[in-house]
Structure formats: structure tokens, C-alpha cells
Amino acid sequence: MNSDQVTLVGQVFESYVSEYHKNDILLILKERDEDAHYPVVVNAMTLFETNMEIGEYFNMFPSEVLTIFDSALRRSALTILQSLSQPEAVSMKQNLHARISGLPVCPELVREHIPKTKDVGHFLSVTGTVIRTSLVKVLEFERDYMCNKCKHVFVIKADFEQYYTFCRPSSCPSLESCDSSKFTCLSGLSSSPTRCRDYQEIKIQEQVQRLSVGSIPRSMKVILEDDLVDSCKSGDDLTIYGIVMQRWKPFQQDVRCEVEIVLKANYIQVNNEQSSGIIMDEEVQKEFEDFWEYYKSDPFAGRNVILASLCPQVFGMYLVKLAVAMVLAGGIQRTDATGTRVRGESHLLLVGDPGTGKSQFLKYAAKITPRSVLTTGIGSTSAGLTVTAVKDSGEWNLEAGALVLADAGLCCIDEFNSLKEHDRTSIHEAMEQQTISVAKAGLVCKLNTRTTILAATNPKGQYDPQESVSVNIALGSPLLSRFDLILVLLDTKNEDWDRIISSFILENKGYPSKSEKLWSMEKMKTYFCLIRNLQPTLSDVGNQVLLRYYQMQRQSDCRNAARTTIRLLESLIRLAEAHARLMFRDTVTLEDAITVVSVMESSMQGGALLGGVNALHTSFPENPGEQYQRQCELILEKLELQSLLSEELRRLERLQNQSVHQSQPRVLEVETTPGSLRNGPGEESNFRTSSQQEINYSTHIFSPGGSPEGSPVLDPPPHLEPNRSTSRKHSAQHKNNRDDSLDWFDFMATHQSEPKNTVVVSPHPKTSGENMASKISNSTSQGKEKSEPGQRSKVDIGLLPSPGETGVPWRADNVESNKKKRLALDSEAAVSADKPDSVLTHHVPRNLQKLCKERAQKLCRNSTRVPAQCTVPSHPQSTPVHSPDRMLDSPKRKRPKSLAQVEEPAIENVKPPGSPVAKLAKFTFKQKSKLIHSFEDHSHVSPGATKIAVHSPKISQRRTRRDAALPVKRPGKLTSTPGNQISSQPQGETKEVSQQPPEKHGPREKVMCAPEKRIIQPELELGNETGCAHLTCEGDKKEEVSGSNKSGKVHACTLARLANFCFTPPSESKSKSPPPERKNRGERGPSSPPTTTAPMRVSKRKSFQLRGSTEKLIVSKESLFTLPELGDEAFDCDWDEEMRKKS
């Protein structure tokens, strides 16, 4: 730079400082220490806006311009000092430094990664984490030398590029042409303090969370001088503004010169207390305030929205997500009167079998936390977790480990049990005292580790519930007692759970979609950063519950002495504060205390009241408010706090009454998910607004019932409104009959997947099994598309599936046909809404199902004819048998209940009865069939073996679904219905039974008395509407079936039930006689039912079947790999007993 440029830059900067930083300079002038170094922080954006020319010079010559800035700053300070009226109170300071910050955000000036060689000489902003700090040194930056010949005295500055070494000139720099090369250092053995400055080197590393997988974080040294020394410590996140420079050792002969890139810092900004680039303005806060205002009447539903957005790729696991969210929210750190610091961070340990999603939670938590470190136990040592002493350039320095780097953040440790024994003890202090004391290589210090530890581990071998957690995972009690929560995830090998998880994974793989209801990762990160600023205080009611629970834990006979100490009470307080933060509150209420006690009871650290829980199969509740009410009743009764219970129940009742009419418009618009559709027959669907219902259907997150939550928005018809009170009455009666079991988390195995058997009583005359069998099969052809199990059909609601919906791929050619179906169904629904009917449903406890099944089988063997009640009307059409939806019921463990529900009559075609019982005993199985592809017309039905539907009054419907969906060790054939449901059905066995009087039979059953064909009975119902099923028969040639549909809308369970049965045509013989009895049941041969046809109105469809080698296969164009929805009862089968029966 020439003199004119230097003058211009100095004048502009001096005027800028005098205008914008006059107050800062006045404060500096009032300081008493004249030798100290004082910074003046200047915003680069404001400076460059004042004069763009300065910005150009600054980018081209940063070192020279910074020196000019310091000189201009001293002149400006002198000018301000002279302008003061009372200069006695101030003094001039010579060590003033201009610190540049706030560079324009562009890739040329702001870097998140370590600079490279091309950046040398540029002024940059670099973000990183401090991993090493050296000792503060004294640096002599200039010396005086005198020429021995001419006695000329000159000053030599230390060369930064050569590690601040002094390089003597080759000749005397005097103007008298002295060519002497001998000089004498005037400084001698001691240096003047004015010629020395503080000097420190730190080492920064790229932030791990900003790196891609497999990238090794790079590091570089940063030079700190003057006032920047000791401005940071190991583990701090920094934004450093400085000049990228290179330096090398002095040259030596025959030694390669090693050049090192360093950053000479001009200004350091510590980001520990900031949100790492997350903007927290009023608009963002207002957005979250509006969110909670929307869920003011049901705050737990709003909380579940957040929980469902936490790690959405993992299905269910409601309890684990709640615990992780509470740990991420964190408690409040306190310092008592004696100076002892009580930690506010909670620690969580996930213990589970392989494949239970532990690592997924750790990875997601590390992503949404600004300061996080993810490591594994097998790859970590005590030094790697705490602090390391390293020797560099002949001196020892301390290098921070994972816990120090995660200070004020999150440290995730996977495979926690892989830590060596002596390494585990090293983190005891870091977990409880939140500090690490080091005495290594003569360096004694204490570093902060105010971090939350989220660890995951596998049990040692098979988890034994009879043993303690310490024995199962081989970790010591002192270490386990430092974890606030220990959740156990046991893989119980539940077939229903396996089916749901596999369907969830496969559906997401095939049809990935982005939800509009779930929160994005950026929104989650912003929310958790925002709530950590809240400081909730404990209320008296919350204190009372936590204190009473702590006392109960201490008095428990099976208590863990190492756990039930004062640490338990502190853990309860921390978790209660964390839940209050999660709920966006500044007070810890009774709701927070009840939730914390319930979570603690479900962990291995609790269990004094109700026992531990397997957290793997916990699911999102259908109604969070009702779940909380059950928690209150159970916990407060156990804690003997009846006054709080009665007061809380009154508060909940008032809140519910206030929100009834306020939420009515919103309730009608909310979509019903499979969780809320689990009602009895004819009962209206519960239109609730829980988070699982409002968001999970958008992203196809499956409910524990196994159905994708993707139903379109459905407005209930007007005739459903009067039945809401009835539903609430039954809900209250059901709640009064509950036992004190820990089922508020709606376990997969009990709450959502244990359907009860029911008995249906119809007021209409009973028809024979054959008539009932022949009148219902035609309804299976009422649409090309079937909904998945537990999900409403697209034909039912008159809407097309979205491209992101799972189970049914997008087909543009279905648009027109579906529109017509929607109009027809809506008009028919309005007509059928006025037809009254009544059905009584009785739910049988699970422990009676086996007994009922045995009695039903015994009665079936003794039966020789159709009961007399099954009379055939003289007219060709009769009322249908109403079949309530078992799979969509909402059963509770060991709680029988009865619901009165309404259905409408329908008219059907019937056929003469037969004698199915004798045929069942004579029937045999057929060989496994082969797969043949055919593109014939939709209504083509290939010839194949026939099946007989036998009248059996007490055959359990649980066996029906089990045998229909699980062809284990049974020859049969596989049939794919238009709903893409693949079901395997053994030939010759009956899976449908007709209605029987409830006074004789406990479980609900249906008998199909069809002697010559295998037919199923669908249910066409929505609310109080029922449909008229139509006759469908199968022949050995193409048949066209049509009929008039009187139904309103098809129930989701109807389609799931249709998928469980096969449509098989009669054999070519067409013999109407019953099949002859075979001596060897191992022989296989088809029976010969007659071929019949019936009219059909709706469009034709294709089917997918596995048949014999001579049979043709008709394949649907739709997805073929969606499994039917089955309840737990479908899997309760003793296959050894079944095989013995067959043999």
C-alpha cells in the first residue's frame, strides 16, 4: 500500500470509530491500568457499508490494514481524551487493538472447515472446537541492535513466519553506507516489558457434527496474543477471526523445510452459550407459543406431536421417545449456599437386545443437539473420554476428550458395556460432579464436563428378568446409580410385533414420503434450544408427589440400596423440570410429576409401585388425556394422596367440559386413524385429536395394531353425533372396571393388539349357513382397490390414494371410476342411514378364549345338522348377518365390556342349505400349487379345488384368522385379493361360522353353511350404516357377477377380513353331490360345487392365486406384498397340538 492509501484508510477508520465506538473508548480511558491491552470490537459489515474501498483494501492487505486500524484507534482515543472537560479522571491507553467481527456470510470469508493452502494471506472466519491449549508464554517481539562499526542503533522485529525468531540483517541498515555485518544486542539478558507480549497457542478441530460419515476431523493451530490469551479453554466452540499464515523452522543444511499453516487470531467469539447458528427471534418463539395455545385443552396431545417427530424412522417405542425427549430438554443446574454444584443434566441408559433401535436414538439425538459427540465404548479409552496429556514441541499439553468436548451438550456412547473396567471408573466424576480433575505430566487442573450422557448397551447374553440390571449388563452399581433412567428393550419375539415392524420398514422403503404434520429436524433442534432457556420452578403439589414417591421407594422391600438414595430424589426433580420444559411451561405441575413417576416406574430404577415394563412395545396412546387420567388414578392411589386425586379429577372434568364445544369443529375435521377406529360393530368412530392420530397418518407411521396411519380426512355423517354420549358412557364404565396394572402406555401385546371375541345378536331371522355363505361373497368385487388391514378402503371414502400412501400404488386410470363410486356410495349411505337396527356386542376376556375354543371344537365334532334357528326366508333376498369388526376394537387387558351398537338391515340373495359338517370330516388337502401368470379379464376365475364352509357354532374366530393367515405346515393355496392382501388358506377347513345365540356361546362366531364352495362374508358398515353384500360364486370359466349395492361405505375390517379367505372356483366335474369320503386324508382331490352366477354392478378386478399345475393364475397389477392385519389371538396357537390333530 502506498502512503495515500494508508492515509485514506486511517482517516476513514478514525472517523468511523469516533462516531460508532466513542462510548467504548470512554470506558477504556477510564480504566486505571495503562499497560493492559484493550480491545474495540468493530463490526465489519457496518464498516464496509461506510466505505467500500476500505473493504477492498482489507481483503487484499489484511495485515497492513490491521496495523493502520490500531494506529487510527489510538489517534481517535487521544482526540476523545482531549475533548473531555475533566481529563483528570481518565488516562491515555497505548495498547488499543481493533478487533474485527461480523464478516459477510459468504464462502470466501466464512468457513466451517479448516482452511487450506490457497487461503494463505486472507482474513477468514473459522469455526471449530478447542481440543488443546498450551501454557501462556512471554513473547519478545522486538529487539534493539547496535552496529559495532558506526554505532548505529536500529530495531529488529521478530519474524512470525520463522516462529518469532530474530534475523539479523546482512549489513548495517544505516544511511551512512556502513557495510559492517557485526552487531551487538542492546537488550542483554533481560527484555523490557514494553517489548514483550503474552503468547499462547491453541489447537482447534473441525466440529464433528458438521462432518460427513467417514471423514476424519482436521485440526490447526491458532496463535493468540495480548488480550486474546486465556479467552478460551478446552472443549469450547469458537468462531475465530484471523489471518491464515504459514510458518517454518529456520533453515538448516540438508534438512527439509516443513511449512505449517496457522491462523493468527484477531478476534475470538465463544459459542458455548449460543445455539450454533440457530436464530431465536420473536417470530420463532411466537410460532411455538401458538402451537401450545392450539393444544391448550389437551397439552399431552401437543407433546405427543413432538415425540412422534423424534426419531420418526423408529416405529412406536413411545416410552423411549418420551425419556429421550426429557433427557434432551434437561433440568436446571443449581449451586447451593456452600458452593456445591448440583447437576441439572440427566443421564439415560438404554439396555436392549440387538436390533431394538438403540443406536438410532443416539444418532438422532446427536443431530438435533448443537454440541454433541458420538462415540462407541470399544473405541474409547479413559483418556479419550476425559483428557489426555500430550507432548508437543518439547512441552506437555492437555488435550480434551469426548466428555470435555461435549461440555454443555450431549455425549452419546454406544456399546457402553464395551468400555474397559478401569475406563468406566474414570467417568464417575464426570457424570455426577460434572467436572474432571487432572494431574498429568505436572499439569494439575479441573475441566468442566457439564454434559448429558446418553448410553446404549446390550445385555450380557440372554436378559434374565429375575436378575438385577447390574448382573444382566455387567456394569457396577456405582456407575448405574448415576443414570437417572435405565430403560430395558427386550425382544420378546412377538410375531405380531415382527409383522408390524417388517411392514413399517418395507412400506417406507417402497414409498418414502415426507410428512407435513411431523416436525422437521431443524424445527426440533430450534425447539430444544429454545426450551433450555426456560427455568421452571417446582410447585407444592409436584413436590408432594415426588417426595411421597421417594419415600415409597425407600420403604420398598425390593428396593435397590445403591439406587434409592438421595440421587433418586434429585433425578425425579431433574426429570420433572425437563418435562415442564418439554411442555413449554415455567412451573412444574402435577402433570409433570405424574408423568415422571410413571416413566420412573417403567424403568429399572423404579418399579416399587407397579413393577418394571418392557419399553420396546409401548405405543402412542389413542387419547393422551385418558391415559393421563389413568396414570393419576393408579399412582395417586398407590401414593395414598386421595385429596390430590379428587382435586385433579375435578380439574380434568372441568377442562373436558370447557373444551367440548370449543373443540367440536376441529374434532369433526380430524382424521381417524386405526387407533381410533377400534370400536365395536356399528359404533361410531372416535374422532380424536391426539398427536399420533394427527401426524402419524401423514408419514405412514404404523400404529401398534399394524396399520399404516394414512387415512384421509373423514367427516362423520350427521347421524353419528347422537351416539357420542353413548360412547362416553361405555368408556366410563370400562374405566371403572380397570385393575391396577401398568398399562397406560398401551402395550402392543395387550392394549392395541389383543382383540376380544364377541357375540353378535341380530333381531332378524337367522338363515342357514349355506344361505349366509352364498349371499355375501359378491361384495368382494366392489372395488379395484382394498385398504390395508386396519385402514379404510379408498372406495369406502371415495378418495384416491396419494402417491406417498403405502399399500396401494398411484394409478391415474382409477380417477374416474373412484369418483363415480364415491358419488354412488354417498347417495346410498344417506338412504341407508334411516334404517334402524341393533346389535349387542359382548367382549370375552382373553383367559376364557382357550376354553371357548375347545368347547366350540367339541360341539363342532358332535354337530350333525344345521341348527333349527337357521331358517331360510321364502323370498330370494334376506337380511345379512352383521359381523362387527373385531380387529378395530379397542380392547383392554382382562376387561370384559359390552357395547350396544346399531346396524341396518340389508337384503341379500340366498341359496338352499347343505350339510357341511359331514363334508368337513371327509375333506382332504391338496398339493401346493404353482404360480401362473395370466392377463385375462378381471372377472376370470380359474378352475381349482373347491372348499367347504362348514357350520360350526363354536369355532373361535381367533382360529379363523390364525388359520387363514398363517399356513404353517399346512398345504394350501395362497390368494391375493384386490387389496393386495396375501392369505393362505388350508383347503377343506372352515374358517367362517354363522351367528349363534349369545346365551349359548361366549365368543363371537360366524357359521357359513355352504356345502360346495368357499365363501367369505364381508362387513359393510360405517357408523350406523350397514351394507348389503352380494352373491359371488366361482366357476370354471369367466363369470360376470353383478348386484345392487345398498351399503353406505365399506368398513376397513371388511377388507381385512376379505383378504383372509380365498376365492376358489369349482372343479371341472361340476358335480353337485358332496365329495366322497376318502380313507386316506393325505389324498388330495377337489370337490365339485355347482357353478352359479349373480349380477354385479361395479367394475371387474383381477386376483392373484397359487393353484395347481393345471390351474391358471390371474395377477393383479397392484402391490402384492402387504400382509393382512392380525391380532394377538391369531398367533395364540399350539402348533404341536394342531399337527397331532391332523395326524
UniProtKB/Swiss-Prot annotation:
GO terms for biological process: DNA damage response; double-strand break repair via homologous recombination; female gamete generation; mismatch repair involved in maintenance of fidelity involved in DNA-dependent DNA replication; protein localization to chromatin; recombinational interstrand cross-link repair. Residues 687-701, 768-782, 868-881, 974-997 have a biased composition (Polar residues). The modification Phosphoserine is found at residues 762, 802, 1109. Residues 300-505 form the MCM domain. It catalyses: ATP + H2O = ADP + phosphate + H(+). Coiled coil: none annotated. Residues 726-735 have a biased composition (Basic residues). It is found in: Nucleus; Chromosome. It comes from the Eukaryota. One of its GO terms (cellular component) is MCM8-MCM9 complex. Changing residue 358 to A: Loss of helicase activity and DNA mismatch repair function but does not affect the interaction with MCM8, MSH2 or chromatin. Pfam families: MCM, MCM_lid, MCM_OB. Changing residue 482 to A: Loss of helicase activity and DNA mismatch repair function but does not affect the interaction with MCM8, MSH2 or chromatin. Keywords: ATP-binding, Chromosome, DNA damage, DNA repair, DNA-binding, Helicase, Hydrolase, Nucleotide-binding, Nucleus, Phosphoprotein. Residues 656-738, 755-815, 868-916, 942-1011, 1063-1105 are annotated as: Disordered. One of its GO terms (molecular function) is enzyme binding. Its main location: nucleus. The keyword Nucleotide-binding applies. ATP binds at residues 352-359. InterPro entries: AAA+_ATPase (IPR003593), MCM (IPR031327), MCM_dom (IPR001208), MCM_lid (IPR041562), MCM_OB (IPR033762), NA-bd_OB-fold (IPR012340), P-loop_NTPase (IPR027417). Its EC number is 3.6.4.12. Component of the MCM8-MCM9 complex, a complex involved in the repair of double-stranded DNA breaks (DBSs) and DNA interstrand cross-links (ICLs) by homologous recombination (HR). Required for DNA resection by the MRE11-RAD50-NBN/NBS1 (MRN) complex by recruiting the MRN complex to the repair site and by promoting the complex nuclease activity. Probably by regulating the localization of the MRN complex, indirectly regulates the recruitment of downstream effector RAD51 to DNA damage sites including DBSs and ICLs. Component of the MCM8-MCM9 complex, which forms a hexamer composed of MCM8 and MCM9. Interacts with the DNA mismatch repair (MMR) complex composed at least of MSH2, MSH3, MSH6, PMS1 and MLH1. Interacts with MLH1; the interaction recruits MLH1 to chromatin. Interacts with MSH2; the interaction recruits MCM9 to chromatin. Interacts with MSH6. Interacts with the MRN complex composed of MRE11, RAD50 and NBN/NBS1; the interaction recruits the MRN complex to DNA damage sites. Interacts with RAD51; the interaction recruits RAD51 to DNA damage sites. Belongs to the MCM family. It is linked to Ovarian dysgenesis 4: A form of ovarian dysgenesis, a disorder characterized by lack of spontaneous pubertal development, primary amenorrhea, uterine hypoplasia, and hypergonadotropic hypogonadism as a result of streak gonads. ODG4 is an autosomal recessive condition. This is DNA helicase MCM9.
